[in-house]
Amino acid sequence: MSAPLETVMSPCQRLDARTGAAAPPKSLAFSIERIMAKTSEPRAGVFEANQGLESGAKKTLNVCPPVPCMIPIQSLAYDVSPKALLNYSELWRSSIRGSLCGPSALCKSNCGICCKNDFNLSQSLAPSGRVIKPQVINQTLGMPSSGSFYYFNYLESSFHPPDLLNGQLLSSSLINAQSQATLSAHHKLFLLDNSKLSALAADKFPNPQFPHKERLPGQLDQVMKENSALTDRTGKIHTKLSANSGEGKPKIFTCEVCGKVFNAHYNLTRHMPVHTGARPFVCKVCGKGFRQASTLCRHKIIHTQEKPHKCNQCGKAFNRSSTLNTHIRIHAGYKPFVCEFCGKGFHQKGNYKNHKLTHSGEKQYKCSICNKAFHQVYNLTFHMHTHNDKKPFTCATCGKGFCRNFDLKKHVRKLHDNVSSSCSHKEISRTGQS
């Protein structure tokens, strides 16, 4: 059994080296005693909410008002019957305000929280299968439910405690989860939750019966691990929002067409071809145009003979591993890019963007000879080859010429691949008959 909280929270006694007497503890610059001494006394009625406020207004519960008191909601770690309900209003008045424990168990700072480590409720308050015991712990843990952590801050909450304890699930976006201050152990009291949260905990931690005192170490590790991951994600989001809000490098270069803001003129220059449609960097092998020289250099690898990355399913080889990863989506049937208008899915993001232009109905690139319009400028560039009879890509089987290598491959796949496969089937049937 753990020691009483008064023993745990007693100040450390230092012995004098010469006299052997207990030396007075060294006063810290930011000790709890000094913090509490500099603040005003809390108002009477520590758990009284402001009843006269309008709906939606914030109700302040005065539990040690000078110190942000963070009390997470923690589910029972025991085998709980789903039908075992508890009158949490009565539990709140009896256990937290110390009517059962006596005045000696109350906090020395008059915050109204029962600091007694071991206390029992009457049988009328504790149904069978429930163990009502607040756990004093030195770390703030949150009950994980569907990837979320639920906290309850008595200082910055607009919810009355009985409403919360009667089973109201509060998302982290509704609750102000303030950073922990250096508090004594009793300010981190865990309140036992109702059967709804207990059922969620049972699903997440499917363990058999275990002692009625504390959580298993594996469960604490699991909760702390998820709590750390949530903190990291929150920090990354906060950093991203801070950068977008102008706290970082100022973004002063704005695109006059779409209003997008950039932090350097070079980035704005690279962005402008998106609106002008200019693709000045053209591949000499296939004629495909690019907005940036770096993209052209990366594209040139396609035309080399070396293809070290092979697909394990079909044996097709690729120049780059990223192209292989995109190709694997075809075998898996994975189309992550879905059109918002028609629901059509695509394996590649580029094809998805090109498809979305068909829904806009805007074809700003027109041919000066036949007035045929296109969504993208490189389609117009390839279309111009039809007027000057320039078809650099020729089919080796039938001799038909094409303006793009893509059209040549599509032609071979639709016509000649079927013919070759049918011929091979005929040869196999002839050998079988002979």
Curated annotation (Swiss-Prot):
GO CC field: nucleus
InterPro entries: Znf_C2H2_sf, Znf_C2H2_type
Motif, Engrailed homology 1 repressor: chain positions: 27-42
UniProtKB keywords: Developmental protein, Differentiation, DNA-binding, Metal-binding, Neurogenesis, Nucleus, Repeat, Repressor, Transcription, Transcription regulation, Zinc, Zinc-finger
GO biological process terms on file: cell differentiation; nervous system development; regulation of transcription by RNA polymerase II
Transport is among the record's keywords: no
Major location (coarse): nucleus
Function of the protein: Transcription repressor. Component of the regulatory cascade that controls the development of dopaminergic (DA) and serotonergic (5HT) neurons.
Family named by the database record: Belongs to the krueppel C2H2-type zinc-finger protein family.
Name of the protein in question: Fez family zinc finger protein 2
Protein's organism: Xenopus laevis (African clawed frog)
Gene expressing this chain: fezf2
